Amino acid sequence: MGVCGAARAQTTIAISMTAPPAAPRLQGPFTFGARPSTPLLFAIPATGQSALSFTATGLPTGVTIAASTGIISGTTPAAGSYPIAVTAMNGAGSATATYTLVAGNTLALTPPMGWNSYDSFGASVTEQEMIDEGTAVRQSLQPFGWNTVVIDYRWYEPGLPIDSNGRYLPATSKYPSATGSNGFKPLADKIHAMGLSFGIHIMRGIPRKSYDANSPIANSTYTAKDAGNNADPCPWDDHMWGVRGDTAAGQAWYDSLFAQYASWGVDFIKIDDMLNNSTKVYHQAEVDAIRKAIDKSGRAIVLSLSPGPDDPSWLPNSASNLNTNANQWRIVNDFWDTGDGPLCDLNCAFTAIRTWAGVGGLTPGHWPDADMLPLGYLGPRKEWSGGNHQTNFTKNEQVTVMTLWTMLPSPLIFGGNPMRLSNDAWTLALLTNEEVLAVSQDGLGARGKRTASGSNEIWSRDLSGGRKAVAFINRGTSDATMSATFSSLGVTGTPAVRDLWHRADVTGMTTSLSVSVPGSAALIYTLTPPGTGGAGGAGGSTGAGGASGSAGRGGGGGSTGGTAAGGTSGRGGAGGTTGAAGRGGTGGAGGGAGAGAGGAAGATGGAAGATSGASGAAGATAGTTGSAGSSAGTGAGTGGVVGTGGTGPTSGTAGSSAAGGGGTAAGGTTAGGGGSSTEGGGCSCDVTAARPTRLSMIVIALAFAACVLRRGRRRC
């Protein structure tokens, strides 16, 4: 595998800009974790025209879903796995998919996705701005799985107010609802009502102000001076001392702190200054104490660790401790769209991500964090690197950033201004490509690995259902053709290939994948081997009169049976027991003929999934009629390639490619995802087969040697 063919001048990548269809489509993550007996909040990510309504079956006792918002809430049940079948409906159709609640020590089972205020507001974001930006996140990003908003540092400035137990309080000049003992609870309640999790940034240690006052530590006999360590300052924030995390007093301090945050309704905490350059590890005793304090707090809180402006390149030394205690941890200094001063640029990020891709022993729920995404508009009060501006990354570099973060995978924390997305179609399309996000949020939680290096890189990542993601990253400035054999990627046979940034199926590749990658850009594909199932991804839609039985986009796609008019749909009517035929895979039965319950049901029109190749609609119509039914539906697919997975999952959970065309039922027309189309348009990928000539290989070798002489091997 590697680069073949001569380099060309750089072109600007064109990604699919197609908006989601009017009919509902359920998005990931499809697995979410929570701690037993703690408050539960999860808003179903769903796209489609307003107004959506939601129903669910399989909800544990004490857990409900709000019909108008899709917010699942209540008290997390006992440890276990709870599949919940969710249906979203609107005037254009309906969609059904299964979400799995995993109760246990199981937060952040897929990389967290959200927005942090720092890149756009520095230390100055206000309560009203958090509400406004949270509203924008809810409208533009949450339907695709972005579900957290975080206030970054120094929310206690000006004034550094503390309570009687030495704990910082929000500055009421910025957060007027935090008067008295309210803290952040009124703001957290408003964020939760949007279906979003609420997070804050804090500094490691204890306020010097509290130490000087020797404040009593709540619910203990200790004081601030018992816990604090004035020989362990933060090197860049003169408000804090360290804490003796391995002492009873230090543990009491952190217990008190996190009990306060839990009472405020905080769901996500980013702790800064966690790196200790002298010991070459995170401040491990404090990390241990923080973990214990969170577990005692009675609330499920995602723990994010940030190093501060130190060199985290040796952090794999701490990997075991981090995997035990943290949900995510930074692996770079602050990542920006420039390399000014101590900041981390794209080359720096590549180096760190390569390092962590090779670290073993990491498990789902514990993620190396390549930092926030400085994309879109960075302002209105950006503090670092050039003031307010649209990101300095080129469009090609922006696609590379999103691809690389997806392949590691890293948490996806947007740093740009969400309110600007309504007038920034490019950035919105970049952040909401559901096929790329499905790789990021894949339930297998596998880590990516670099399989080819040099001036161009190839990365692969195992996905659920036996599939693979492969990314071709062009580190050069000129366009280049890159290729990899399927066997070198661990794929047997000829897989179905899906180009995710262009939302297009790729045909004609039998033993290898050869693609043209614009300079400084990246392309990402999914490979679905013959006979494998599709992913559990986005639930597709059935038409206004049909049951929620459409297979989702991707390997779950195929012709679907709609519910016939005249009665309750039969058991097979809601999408059939298998998905659809995958190209090269098993020809799938579509909706299936579902007899009505008790003889009173109407017929379901199932599609006999006769096609297993790359063309054609689904097969003949089928359907039985219950005693009270009025007619059988028709299940012929409307055209296009039928899915890309093999045997798809049940109830219309998604696969890796576009959904197959829908069938028509007596009660309405089902809406599939459009077969092999690019979901109503989008861009086609420049995919060409190429064979290297001896001359071209000599040219590439000479160019690489010249680059090494000029810039060093790591930058070539």
Predicted regions and their residues:
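Ser/Thr-rich, Pro/Gly/Ala-heavy low-complexity intrinsically disordered linkers and tails
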Residues: 4-9, 532-705
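Glycan-recognition surfaces
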Residues: 227-232, 244-246, 252, 256, ...
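Strand-loop-strand motifs at the edges of beta-sheets in extracellular beta-sandwich domains
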Residues: 61-78
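Extracellular interdomain linkers/hinges and stalk-like, low-complexity segments
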Residues: 10-48, 93-111
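Aromatic-lined carbohydrate-binding/catalytic grooves of carbohydrate-active enzymes
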Residues: 119, 137-279
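C-terminal beta-strand-rich structural cap/linker in extracellular carbohydrate-active enzymes
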Residues: 508-533
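C-terminal membrane-anchoring or membrane-association module
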Residues: 704-716
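Carbohydrate-binding surface patches
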Residues: 399, 405-408, 413-415, 452-491
